[in-house]
Amino acid sequence: MTGMKNKQEYEEELEMGKGGFTLPGESGYEELTLKMAEKWGADVIRDSDGTVLSDEITHAGYGIYSTICIIRDHNAWAKENQDKLQQTFLCTPPQAAESDTLTIGLMDSFFAEQFRINDSAESLEYWEVYDRTTNVKIDNADWSYDKEKGSVSLSGIIPFHKYTVSFLAYRIWEEISMYNHTTNHWDKEHLMQIDPRYPETQEYLLGWMKHWCETHPDTTVVRFTSMFYNFVWIWGSSERNRNLFSDWGSYDFTVSVPALQEFEKQYGYRMTAEDFINKGQLHVTHMPGNAKKADWMAFINDFVISFGRKLIDMVHSYGKKAYVFYDDSWVGVEPYNGRFQEFGFDGLIKCVFSGYEARLCAGVDVPTHELRLHPYLFPVGLGGAPTFMEGGNPTLDAKKYWNSVRRALLRAKIDRIGLGGYLHLVEGFPDFCDYIEKVADEFRLIRSFHDAGEPYRIKTRVAVLHYWGSLRSWTLSGHFHETYMHDLIHINEALSGLPVDVKFISFEDVKNGILKDVDVVINAGRAGSAWSGGDAWKDEELVTALTKWVHEGGCFIGVNEPSAVEGYDTYFRMAHVLGIDEDTGARVCHGRWIFETADPEHLIPEGAGVEAKENRYL
């Protein structure tokens, strides 16, 4: 039921109009739950954050998904062990000094319900004060911390220079619960998140997991949401700027004193606050990383696998399957780094708005691939727009998202789809219920096509070239509405439904000979970004390999500022291949070739266009 099925089973389900669908059930709405399970052809019923399933539902003959967030819902233990909450480095905004002294309030700019200063002796060893005018670290003797006021006072500094304080803070409200709480106007206790980096936390969680398995005999699949560390989401104190920083792929929320200490022992050098804060910019996934970031990511991945495997093995020992949600606390799981199979997961679930996210799920080596469709059954959607409430149109939302996702499903097989949220909200939207019935039937039909054979592909083999390579296959850092400003996400979305083989390669891959298996290379992004490549283009071996490959028949496609880096005869290092370069000001007095622009028929679809760029020349 929850694993892979043979063709006959799929055909039988297709004929009966059921299977491959996960329905969010809700205690108190048993009749509705079973009615919609029949209408949508569900074979599995799940709970959601804030809902439970009654015995009537769990004993109705369906598979049961139970959702657990392993690091939250432990408030009783967390209150007794507040030194074992998860942490992060925060950095105050730059503040200009008017004299040789300055006092900076640490929490003035941050959401007090999300963070609390960690001012333990071990934590203070990692705090740093910087002169941001010179970007020089201030000696510890020149600043002091006032515990009662939550502030740092500087002395002997330079007037009218800017200063920041980087400090460790406990995260006292789990971010996804915080979002759901504020979005749905819940009135209940804030959930804290505990850090399994501590041996005491590990012992507690293993005991909790054992008890949970024993007290949930009807559960067939345990859905981990997800592992231990959430993507970064820092809220501000002002409602006018609540979302200070969010990055789906960043590792800032994995920091703790014991993690920093263990890293130093294992890698032989000490990570500092500035290694994370990075002049206040943090290490955005959209920018190239460095060796220290790579080491930290590998270090966290080692830990998440080692302790995560213990929990998964326990779930398996009770005869249950273990699926993981590829969102929320996914950091450190890294399904595309070549080690994902070490977890032992039976399935992967990805929430999707777009085709590229369906391909992101389908490309992971795991027995079962499942998509969680939007819109979620919430009163409001992401961004606060009304959904299942007055003024909302969830049917239109569902059509928009399904149209984006469906084309990708024709290219790569997905085993299951489903919804999440509060089922009772659909009662006022019968057209939505009818449309999801159609979606479920379409999905089962598409799935049956894959059982008949591989989809048709043309011979062209496409490679998307950027800093992260295969580690960030298909995605950049989050959903489309979070990354739409980047050219590459539009390209990924287009590729997700095209009949071509697609791979994602790094600059090192090029130097190691991967181009022999590629017909087209796409490099797309703003200069200096991870997607264009930044300083990677200073490598003559890279430029030579690509030039030779094009000479032998390869096709190099550049978008926006491909191969851009300063310091050479051309701004685009591949200008000799592209036939075009960008003038950054150095060629303002030079002559230019005259050319005419034309729109070739059938090259650009009706209604679409290509944005013109200034300062480009032949």
What are these regions (language model features)?
Residues 2-532, 536-540, 550, 558-560, ...:
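Glycan-processing catalytic domains of CAZymes
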Residues 533-615:
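A glycine-rich, often tryptophan-bearing local segment used as a flexible ligand/cofactor-contacting loop or short
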